[in-house]
């Protein structure tokens, strides 16, 4: 396989390029969903939490965004490889959310990868286990590990299949 070439967004035109090119393209290939992490947590020996309701009645579920490389290739963006290479699952940092990774998602799509971003418990639109929306709390860090592994083995694997 030859070397991949992906052109970075020109910093002098960054805001304009993100607004006029990147975000509209991402919108066309984005799929939003909800992941029920209870099976993954039980499998890891962790009792599932119900989560405090805050979005659409999805008790305990985790929000995610996935970007399909086939749909991206169909819009024929300049610089896209149009060669499916697999899927990438992004695990965001503490107090972050999926959309923070829009630019990175763009580069992976250009390179031929589908991308999935799980919003961990207590982050973004995912279930929270405290009333204070400004506070990120988790009872056991292994819950994050179990949730991400379960997500990668199900949703991520679907996108990796192409």
Which residues fall in each region the model found?
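An N-terminal hydrophobic leader/cap segment in hydrolases
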Residues: 1-56, 63-70, 74-80
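Alpha/beta-hydrolase active-site loop
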Residues: 136-158
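Conserved alpha/beta-hydrolase
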Residues: 98, 103-131
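Well-ordered alpha-helical segments embedded in enzymatic catalytic cores
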Residues: 63, 93, 100, 147-151
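Active-site glycine-rich loops that stabilize anionic/oxyanionic intermediates
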Residues: 85-96
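Secondary-structure boundary motif
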Residues: 72, 110, 157-161
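Glycine-rich phosphate-binding loop signature in dinucleotide/nucleotide-binding domains
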Residues: 81-83, 155-162
